[in-house]
From Swiss-Prot:
Pathway note: Lipid metabolism; sphingolipid metabolism
Gene name, Swiss-Prot/TrEMBL: UGCG
Major enzyme class: transferase
Organism ancestry: Eukaryota, Metazoa, Chordata, Craniata, Vertebrata
Ranges per topology, Lumenal: 1-10, 216-287, 329-348
Top-rank taxon: Eukaryota
Organism, scientific name: Homo sapiens
E.C. number: 2.4.1.80
Record's protein name: Ceramide glucosyltransferase
Tissue expression from the record: Found in all tissues examined.
Length: 394
């Protein structure tokens, strides 16, 4: 009996520690957002002396927003940069979009590369290789096709690239779009995702997504260049790790990496979350324990039980109050990341928040059930440590 009592006391202590850690993450993310995001960065060097940047743009297929998203990169207010458009397939309709923009902006240093170069299983790396090999500037900016920028985005990122910084990344967010699926995405990327993303980076953990990353090319080359990361599906994590292992720091842009895909749905969002969870479990096995207990509903039950065990508080009352506080703080976080008025109502937020939180266990269990992922045009079986093998149809 004494052993059981000791175990229960230990579980209660764990519940209170979980409470402190999760709410510390809430406060860190909100404070950082208020102090850093959506602020104009201080110019650290004269405009004319800003270093050259090679932009690598991987393209696959066309959606309704592609041409508008791409055009924002041709309209950057930056003294010296090149745009390297990379398309894998010769019959990809994205080629026509690229040619249209190349004709419209003849004064922009831009080139189109078709065909890619097979160097590993990662299709994004294979697509980018021809552009990477001819990149002429010391800074490489890898930016996904669905990202939209404003004229001073690149200037902001380069200003963060100080002497000891080797990688500058943007916090992923989502542009205002129509429909509930867009609201669901915006709620996720404005609440749960930045809470973990920001708190991890603030506390020294290297958490980077490859949607918009500015890196020193010489540091990447020291690590073996892009080809060294072609064996991984989550190439962004391993590129960031290689840069950190060489003693370089990371910095976050004051502007978000604004996703503006024209193709979106609830099922696409769910599939994307499952894929990301599979990758995290594969790279960081501790995710199996940490991820479920850090979500609102599960965490509230654990902490509620601890409060009941120690203070005899009603579990369900505590659960409801804790979820309500989480819900309110998430809304504060979302407004901070948005940097302005939201395009949906508080009722839409409440519904999207509840559905997103309710999906978490299903997403996690689905990721555990099947270790294979589908990405772009291929299917891959994940291996322990982050590598993968392509599943070929016989």
């Amino acid at each position: 009996m004494a052993l059981l009592d000791l175990a229960l006391e230990g579980m209660a202590v764990f519940g209170f520690v979980l409470f402190l850690v999760l709410w510390l993450m809430h406060f860190m993310a909100i404070i950082y957002t208020r102090l850093h995001l959506n602020k104009k960065a201080t110019d650290k060097q004269p405009y004319s002396k800003l270093p050259g940047v090679s932009l690598l743009k991987p393209l696959k297929g066309v959606d309704p927003n592609l041409i508008n998203n791409l055009e924002t990169f041709f309209e950057l207010d930056y003294p010296k940069y090149e745009v390297l458009l990379c398309v894998q397939d010769h019959d990809d309709p994205a080629i026509d979009v690229c040619k249209k923009l190349l004709g419209k902006y003849p004064n922009v240093d831009a080139r189109l590369f078709i065909g890619g170069k097979k160097v590993g299983i990662n299709p994004k790396i294979n697509n980018l290789m021809p552009g990477y090999e001819v990149a002429k500037y010391d800074l490489i900016w890898i930016c996904d096709s669905g990202i939209r920028v404003i004229p001073d985005t690149l200037t902001d990122m380069v200003n963060q690239m100080t002497e000891k910084v080797g990688l500058v990344h943007g916090l992923p967010y989502v542009a205002d779009r129509q429909g509930f699926a867009a609201t669901l995405e915006q709620v996720y990327f404005g609440t749960s995702h930045p809470r973990y993303y920001i708190s991890a980076n603030v506390t020294g953990f290297k958490c980077v997504t490859g949607m918009s990353c500015l890196m020193r090319k010489d540091v990447l080359d020291q690590a073996g260049g892009l080809i060294a990361f072609a064996q991984y599906i989550a190439e962004d994590y391993f590129m960031a790790k290689a840069i950190a292992d060489r003693g370089w720091r990371f910095a976050m842009s004051t502007q978000v990496a604004m996703q503006n895909s024209g193709s979106y749905s609830i099922s696409q969002f769910q599939s994307r979350m499952i894929r990301w969870t599979k990758l995290r479990i594969n790279m960081l096995p501790a995710t199996i324990i940490c991820e479920p207990i850090s979500e609102c509903f599960v965490a509230s039950l654990i902490i509620g039980w601890a409060a009941h065990h120690v203070f005899r508080w009603d579990i369900m009352v505590f659960f409801m109050c804790h979820c309500l506080a989480w819900f309110i703080f998430d809304y504060i976080q979302l407004r901070g990341v948005q940097g302005g008025t939201l395009c949906f109502s508080k009722l839409d937020y409440a519904v999207a928040w509840f559905i997103r939180e309710s999906m978490t266990i299903y997403i996690f269990l689905s990721a555990l059930w099947d270790p294979t992922i589908s990405w772009r045009t291929g299917r891959y079986r994940l291996r322990c440590g982050g590598t993968a093998e392509e599943i070929l149809d016989v």
